[in-house]
Amino acid sequence: MPPQLALLLTSAFVLIVLTIEYRRSDITSAASWILSLWLAYSGSKGIGAFLNINTTIESGSLPDRYFLLSVGIVGILILFKRGFPLGAALKRNGLFVLILAYMLLSVVWAKAPGISFRRWGRELITLIMICLLISEEFPAKTFVSAFKRAIYFYLPFSILLIKYFGIFGREYNRWTGE
């Protein structure tokens, strides 16, 4: 089978499975889909890797930055729309806030402050996603639904990449070549 046909069939299959999951699930909020997108992104290579964008670790990938920025902004907007009590949540989790503040402070003495700051930003987006999850009516059901959607995306596309697009689906040890 030609790789393009396999990609088309896999994409159609994933869309059908996601549609079935959407209809069967009682979790239909937009936040659960944002969480699913973020989970799918977090568990795979970056978007830049699939687009063959050669970047250094210091500069990162522009599509990845834009994706994370978009997900973070949409998450913040949803939290504001829901009236999420961020101040109260931060007060109840003082130790977590202290760890985040320490991580931000560590940017000052890091060997590569730009990389450290970007990684801190990713942790902040993780916090936004957690707040989205706990602001849902049924957080446990929402998490299961978002995780299912991410798996429905991962599994078929992983098989597709391994079988038809080996350059993206297989990686060898850079030190031994195995």
Report each predicted region and the residues it spans.
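Transmembrane alpha-helical segments
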Residues: 72-76, 125-137, 155
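Transmembrane signal-anchor hairpin modules in multi-pass inner-membrane enzymes, especially those
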Residues: 1-104, 138-149
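Amphipathic alpha-helical interaction segments
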Residues: 83, 111-112, 131
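Membrane-interfacial helix-loop-helix modules of multi-pass inner-membrane proteins that assemble, modify
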Residues: 44-57, 105-119, 141-149, 153-178
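Residues at structural and domain junctions
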Residues: 23, 103-106, 119, 129-132
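Alpha-helical transmembrane segments of multi-pass membrane proteins
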Residues: 9, 95-99, 120-131
